[in-house]
Amino acid sequence: MNYSGSNGIRRPPTDRERQLAERRSREALARRRRAEKRAKRKKIAAIVLVLILIAAAIYAIALIRDRAGGNVVLSAKELAAVKREEALEELKDYPVYADAGGLSSKCVLLCDLTTGKVICEKNAAETVKIASLTKIMTAVVAIENVPDLNAGYTMSESVIRYLRSENASVAGFAAGERVTGYDLLYAAMLPSGGDGAMGLADLTAGSQEAFVDMMNAKAKELGMNRTRFTNATGFDDDGNYSCAYDLSLLFEYALKNDLFRKVATSSTYTTSSTAEHPGGIKLRSTVYGGFADNGIGMGDVIGGKTGYTYDAGRCLATYAVKDGEEYILITLGASRTPYHFSDANKIYSEFVDN
């Protein structure tokens, strides 16, 4: 404010002028503070709204994922899985495995099943061929849909001939051999036998095609939105694919089944006695064997599933338990043996053991 007399000479303000100036200053300060409070309230309201929406999303996902026919009470592990599903679009926020020079696998996902936390990931949402990790779904669908796995199944000549033409891994059943559903299950999981997988498909659904439909329906139920199956074995096919994230959902779900967990963590199994194999066939886990045969320590790993085709590379799903905490690791696309095993050993050592 300009305090000037009639002659233009600046003079000191009067008491009234000082009071007026101070009042205007106080009013301006009060207006600024009110504006700041309004802005703060709006910010808080926005944060509260976001939290409400997140809570609603979690509740909605829980409802969708509920498989108990109306029961929406989730266990701690189920809630952890829901939280991990929500994180799919946020994978970039998790620590990407940076030592690319020392890691052969193209896709990686390490999860703490107890908390649902993604500990380590690399290209986890990228769709790729998954080879015999497909058989995890084959086992799940068979376990859930065959009323009695003691039921007999006669291995067909056409299955044996087809697998031979594909140079596929087999458990060693003979054409015409009468085996049980349990034999087929262990045959598919431990030595990754195509005869076990195709036998399970026929035993469960009556045909390979009908069984594949069941596999895809289960994938949809589990929220495996980046997954599609075209066969029960994992043979290379452009239409048979998944990603590390989806496979973690499948593997976690499968491990909740006591029978699957027992099979996946077994190191050996002997099939029932038949005319063709009076002493049964001794099956050996390619997970246990893969670590041991290559001189790589298993650490806390107690089971899992291997996979290999030329297009898919070396794939591995492992289950580990340390200090009461459960972990699953999916690695896909390692260039050659034993890199999928050494990758697993390295990742567990760095992110779990330390």
Predicted regions and their residues:
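Perimembrane helix-loop junctions in membrane proteins
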Residues: 35, 53, 66-70
